[in-house]
Amino acid sequence: MVTIVLGSQWGDEGKGKITDYLSQDATLCCRSAGGHNAGHTIVHDSVTYDFHILPSGLVSPKCINLIGAGTVVHIPSFFKELSALADKGLVDVDSRVFISDRAHVCFDLHSVVDGLEEAKLGGRKVGTTGKGIGPCYSDKASRRGVRVGEILDEEVFERKLRNLESGYRSRFGELAYDVEDEINRFKEYRQKLKPYIVDQLSFLQKYKNDDRILVEGANALMLDLDHGTYPFVTSSSTGLGGAIQGLSLNPTKIKNIIGVVKAYTTRVGSGPFPTEQLNEFGEKLQVAGREFGVTTGRKRRCGWFDLVLCRYSLAVNHYTALNLTKLDILDDFDEIKVAVAYTLPDGTRLEDSYPADPNLIEKLEVEYITLPGWKTNTMGLTKYEDLPENAQKYVEYIERGLDGVPIKWIGTGPAREHLIIR
């Protein structure tokens, strides 16, 4: 049995927490796409762990972890993150994580190019994390990228990296980058990395009859290269299709597709955001929710819950259950708004589809309903019946608005135990 956890909005929904909870019973936890641009925090036994490229199943001592073929891996960050987890007391992290030999290598070169490309876009920049993810995926699509398995072949690796550097230097001129310096650093990584590299397909065959495989999505559906608010998206497939493709999953083995939705909406970086609140409500959400990016430290843009967006996300990803997170952040609001429809400039009303044109999204009007707040502390609650009546009504309104897909888990705080299971 395969369970897939996916972000339903623009990321930062709290996927790591439910993944951490579910990984307690998982044999294998996998990352299918993305790189160290992703970021989430897990609080376990009062210890805070920050994850970027590593699967958060590492917090569970019996869980094996795989970084799949659809990912891009910055090797220095991989080792730095492993070391940080070990320093915080996680056991056997070195022996419980593996990387597909088909994953692509994200170089420091890609980070340099990322910054140059963003600078050229000026006022229409995407707002990337600056980690080089886009240029790395671009090299992959152009068939000039370097795969993790190729690191082990010194001659091939060095030739391909020099060719990459030469191509970018022809395009941009002088680069603040020394290719020989990066090549020399990989001389140190080569043997160190070897035990982690596996043939993904044969590796997964060992688990084909196991009913406890957990897939941890990165980013979220609205950042998907095909289905998100293009071009203000990441460079990988962040939805259900990307999970299947990046890990060569058997679709018939998928039992659960869990959509993680924050009780309000946030976004990092540029791009349209219909329910964004550039006022005291947005600021209050930002402060109460501690909305700062784990990867970049940037303030997240904040706004009301968007049913239109989440209906679209549901239609693409086919969620079988939902995890509503950070409900407690709304505790101090007198009233809470939910977006239920958009009106386009020509008068067309949309309830369950999302415009492809970002310029059109910027011009639409949002229709809200207003629900009463509950003005009661819900942090740390673990029983649904203990929620204030208005908090229950809020949960059930969202559930009805999303075709009755059950909200099985409700987050009421940052720790693993701050969770209501319905």
UniProtKB/Swiss-Prot annotation:
GO terms for cellular component: cytoplasm. IMP binds at D12, E13, G14, K15, N37, A38, G39, H40, T129, R143, N219, T234, R298. Keywords: Cytoplasm, GTP-binding, Ligase, Magnesium, Metal-binding, Nucleotide-binding, Purine biosynthesis. InterPro entries: Adenylosuccin_syn_GTP-bd (IPR018220), Adenylosuccin_syn_Lys_AS (IPR033128), Adenylosuccinate_synth_dom1 (IPR042109), Adenylosuccinate_synth_dom2 (IPR042110), Adenylosuccinate_synth_dom3 (IPR042111), Adenylosuccinate_synthetase (IPR001114), P-loop_NTPase (IPR027417). Substrate binds at V294, T295, T296, G297, R298, K299, R300. Its main location: cytoplasm. One of its GO terms (molecular function) is adenylosuccinate synthase activity. It is found in: Cytoplasm. The active site is at D12 (proton acceptor), H40 (proton donor). Its EC number is 6.3.4.4. Pfam families: Adenylsucc_synt. Binds 1 Mg(2+) ion per subunit. GTP binds at residues 11-17, 39-41, 300, 326-328, 411-413. SUPFAM superfamilies: P-loop containing nucleoside triphosphate hydrolases (SSF52540). Signal peptide: none annotated. Pathway: Purine metabolism; AMP biosynthesis via de novo pathway; AMP from IMP: step 1/2. Gene3D superfamilies: Adenylosuccinate Synthetase, subunit A, domain 1 (3.40.440.10), Adenylosuccinate Synthetase, subunit A, domain 2 (1.10.300.10), Adenylosuccinate Synthetase, subunit A, domain 3 (3.90.170.10). Its cofactor is Mg(2+). It catalyses: IMP + L-aspartate + GTP = N(6)-(1,2-dicarboxyethyl)-AMP + GDP + phosphate + 2 H(+). Mg(2+) binds at D12, G39. Belongs to the adenylosuccinate synthetase family. Homodimer. Plays an important role in the de novo pathway and in the salvage pathway of purine nucleotide biosynthesis. Catalyzes the first committed step in the biosynthesis of AMP from IMP. This is Adenylosuccinate synthetase. It comes from Talaromyces stipitatus (strain ATCC 10500 / CBS 375.48 / QM 6759 / NRRL 1006). The lineage of its organism: Eukaryota, Fungi, Dikarya, Ascomycota, Pezizomycotina.
